[in-house]
């Protein structure tokens, strides 16, 4: 409420308003000071005045554009001012040169000159207004007008724009002011309109400023009486508006231009004289391409409106003129026919005299309807002063009659009247256009005569348009007809029609026809002399008035048609065939297209993709849910999705080779160790299994070497110590006792995964964590844990079962024993299964040799790759890729070797014996690679596994 009271107090008194203005002034000055501080600070920081261009533009009185680059540089401004001091208009070439010289656009150069000219004219106009105001004050004080040459128009209104009788108001030197005659004032107008009529022209001629012109045009817009506006047009008001329009366009006064166009749209210009319309049309037509779109669009719309209006008015005038002419002709013929009927029908001379008068009248009508040339009318003196008349007016005024060239014979068709007029939107025809039209018409006539070979082949027959309509000639008309026989040779003689027994016959005649009334229907008979009207046993003849349409549009005489048909009937067949060949049409058969069977494309109904697409569509079921809460997160689940899918069935096939950590040993030592390992594995397989205690003692003294050999990582031992230990391994390799048995048991086989689960309970997937890295140091430490006899027994059963599964495929002799042993061990495994859950760590150790893939044993000694573990299901089909010799060796030493190992392990509870041959890196794969090298080469083409692992070896 307090704020509302303060607002009321501010606007309630003058003092409050002054206080408000003072406060706004203080705020404005404070903002200016802040802007000045910002500019000064920016100038100190950057060293450049940010308002330099604006200040220069203000000093030079240049209009600032929207962007800084729109401003002219000082050099360009100085040069343009020097050029403007010499001349105020430059050409396009000079504008381009200045633009290229100073780096400005041509539009900027043109705008500079236009702006400077506008400023100069404004100064001149202001000085004139001061003189006019001083003269007005002097006239009011003294009562005598002062004449000054400076008050004259720069572009005075043409004197011929005003009729002498229009008004006597003067605006030049030495003339006096007079009132408009009362007879020129339109009757029945209001007082305001009367005041407008009395004073408008005096004010229009005296006004020189655009502001005063705007006020006067607004006064014209307020007049709604059509008679007053027509009077304004008749007295020359359009020419004054035209002068103002040209001045406003030259000085780019857009507001004045728009108002003048509105006034022109308000005035009934269809009542204006042609000379006034010519002047205003030229001025408005120049505004069609004005640079401001609003003005150009208004000018185009105004011209279009005038074009339609004038075309409509001219059509109405033409129709009225034709109707009035037809009415006068019909009245004249009616009077003559009535006079003939009322006269004495027995006197033929009177009838002939009447017919003679009628023929003369008809000839007058025909001459009036003939071709219209550029005839001089009553107001031709005013038309000669037209600069450019209305297009529709020119269309009615300019008509061309074809003139036959001297020495040129008449063509096949008589020269007809050709009316060529400009269209409603084209310019008036010039003399060149008329001459071109004549030459074109003559060319077309000669071309048409060449295209018609039939008259030349026939001979005398020609098709000539009639020059005169049907008329009745008397005996007095015969001398002129006989005198003009040479001129009317080619004129067709009208045929006569005589109905006989109800049918009409067509007969040619040799002269003008005569009409004779007979008993019955009207008969027209040919005569060989001048026509005569004779009553024959019947009533007096009745002259039927000829209609104007029949005069204007004479029908084609039937004689030409009948004669042409008769001549063609008399022609021989060869002549007709010759004429037909001249007009023969060449027919061309379009090229055909034959379809090749190879282009056929099946519809795809029996394609394999149809079933795939059908199944794909079945997966997309349309489901309707009752509410938003019932919609699942992913409703587009396949309908045949497998429940509880086992990912272990999917084999893990690496896309690239696993990274390897190379040892610091030289390549020669690696090759040497490979050869030694191959020899050791070969000798160990042939010798009896005995443990190498010396090697075991050496390895137990160096646990780092054990870790390096098992994990594939380099140890901290020196190179010499490493070589010594390797020499011990070479010498002790043949004495190893249990390596051959474990090689068979620990061999790792890689093949495609089996889709069926294994029946071995030891491979039920308990030790997945241990399978991931079977040769880690953690697992090696775990081997020292004490194991009970039951655990060892369970482990031995698992090993027996695994070996028994690989033997029967290649050793039929041991088939029954292996089946019995496998069945017994399966029953014991079911009994011992609860205890195996408590010994998970030991079970992981037993599964290590089984789940190890071939990727971990690429190097024989000293380097172990980072093996990738696969599921136990992927090991079921691996035994099928090995030869019969391996399985026979394994079956011979399988039971005894593993029993010896189990006894050795049970004799040392808590510890596990270790030898190089029993090492995970020295498994059966190395020996198998040397023994079965030939078989691998032989089976490489059939087994994709060897083709795949060539790059791993």
Swiss-Prot record:
Region of interest: 5 X 5 AA repeats of Q-P-V-N-G: 498-538
Tissue/organ expression: Expressed in shoot apex, root apex, leaf primordia and floral buds.
Annotated spans, Disordered: 404-430, 606-668, 733-763, 861-953
Sequence repeats: 498-502, 507-511, 516-520, 525-529, 534-538
Lineage: superkingdom: Eukaryota
Effect after changing residue 761 to L: In strain: cv. Lac-1
Effect of residue 457 to C: In strain: cv. Cvi-0
Effect caused by changing residue 542 to I: In strain: cv. Sakata and cv. Sha
UniProt-reported outcome of changing residue 618 to Q: In strain: cv. Akita
GO terms assigned for molecular function: DNA binding; DNA-binding transcription factor activity
Biased composition (Polar residues): 414-425, 733-742, 888-934, 942-953
Keywords: Developmental protein, Differentiation, DNA-binding, Flowering, Homeobox, Nucleus, Repeat
Protein name: Homeobox protein LUMINIDEPENDENS
